[in-house]
Amino acid sequence: MSLLALGINHKTAPVSLRERVTFSPDTLDRAIESLLRQPSVQAGVVLSTCNRTELYLSVEQRADLRQQIVDWLCSYHQLTPEEVSDSLYWHQDNEAVSHLMRVASGLDSLVLGEPQILGQVKKAFSESQREQALSADLERLFQKTFSVAKRVRTETEIGTSAVSVAFAACTLARQIFESLARLNVLLVGAGETIELVARHLHQHQVQHMMIANRTRERAQSLADEVGAEVIPLADIDARLADADIVISSTASPLPIIGKGMVERALKARRNRPMLLVDIAVPRDIEPEVGDLANAYLYSVDDLHAIIQGNMAQRQEAAVQAEHIVQQECANFMAWLRAQGAVDTIREYRAQAEQRRAEAESEALAALAQGVEAEAVIRRLAHRLTNRLIHAPTKSLQQAAGSGDAQRLQMLRDSLGLDHN
């Protein structure tokens, strides 16, 4: 068995490709079921966010393993291998373990140290738990990863500064507008990212916010917290002209705001400028909106420069975090390798127990026949010693006879002969 990590992320692929490789939450269960039908896949976790899509797998080794997994990914998303081959990365065993730990700790994020990714990894893990798609080694890996991420947060300052995609979106708005307090803001969606955006804006005294969401209940809870108005998604067209700033992050597979909708809004606004920030993957706002005069459209990739400006203070903490990940990765791999000896140890113990039971039975029979106890004990000790050292003695003789000094030393080490 082997552990694998396969995926694409913001470093290897543009949003135009990433949005084609995302797994919808509504169909994730079917995706996992389909993945587990692949001959070599024994267990799997699918992590799909706006910045990355990754498969973490426990697999049986085979010559065509990589091609098999890539073919499945392409077939599922109706892509050709040529479209994704240059953007895919592939990690195995030690590298896969290290990669997952780095991802969950925020070390591989667009925003170094951002905390949201850990919750997303936990959610992906829980989904595989529900689908009974985990093996013992994969489950142990994720549980270990969660403790590593917690240790990174506790022992370093990687998460102390308020840097995130949500924060970057708000920073962009503050750079374009002198003051946000009197502006009207439309937030589309009510997930974790929009929650963070809403709280950032609320902290900057934004007084007029609208939240458009598919389900009113989730949006209402957030609206009550930040003093916003809730509107249905269907009302966006009618209310868009009221918005100076639009920030969107939903899980919709198709754009929610189109070029024509924005054109009508700009006309109603008498061409007063509108900032639109699309931090969804797949995109919520048609990219052609960026061609309109007075419409300033930014995608999640455009936020990268802003984010980089807030990174310096996290770099030192990241070095500490990397040391923790390396240490914990080595610990996990040692545990994983030890699992390979479990069956051998079990057999060895069973064999020793059988020989002990045989010697004990012979001793009890001798006592029952009236043989003196002292003689029985001496014979028991002698026979048990001979039986237990018989196999190691033969191995030592064979190693010495063949001149295999390395094997001879290994046997000496395993028998503890150099520790007395």
Swiss-Prot record:
Gene Ontology biological-process entries: protoporphyrinogen IX biosynthetic process from glutamate
User: SUPFAM superfamilies under this entry?
Assistant: Glutamyl tRNA-reductase catalytic, N-terminal domain, Glutamyl tRNA-reductase dimerization domain, NAD(P)-binding Rossmann-fold domains
Task: Tell me which residues this entry annotates as catalytic.
Answer: 50
Q: Which residues bind substrate?
A: 49-52, 109, 114-116, 120
Q: Where is this site: Important for activity?
A: 99
Q: In which pathway does it act?
A: Porphyrin-containing compound metabolism; protoporphyrin-IX biosynthesis; 5-aminolevulinate from L-glutamyl-tRNA(Glu): step 1/2
Q: What is this enzyme's EC?
A: 1.2.1.70
Keywords carried by this UniProt record: NADP, Oxidoreductase, Porphyrin biosynthesis
EC top class, in one word? oxidoreductase
Q: What does this protein do?
A: Catalyzes the NADPH-dependent reduction of glutamyl-tRNA(Glu) to glutamate 1-semialdehyde (GSA).
Name the protein family: Belongs to the glutamyl-tRNA reductase family.
The domain section of the record reads: Possesses an unusual extended V-shaped dimeric structure with each monomer consisting of three distinct domains arranged along a curved 'spinal' alpha-helix. The N-terminal catalytic domain specifically recognizes the glutamate moiety of the substrate. The second domain is the NADPH-binding domain, and the third C-terminal domain is responsible for dimerization.
Q: How does it assemble?
A: Homodimer.
Additional detail = During catalysis, the active site Cys acts as a nucleophile attacking the alpha-carbonyl group of tRNA-bound glutamate with the formation of a thioester intermediate between enzyme and glutamate, and the concomitant release of tRNA(Glu). The thioester intermediate is finally reduced by direct hydride transfer from NADPH, to form the product GSA.
> What is the name of this protein?
Glutamyl-tRNA reductase
Q: Which species is this UniProt entry from?
A: Edwardsiella ictaluri (strain 93-146)
Q: What is the lineage of its organism?
A: Bacteria, Pseudomonadati, Pseudomonadota, Gammaproteobacteria, Enterobacterales
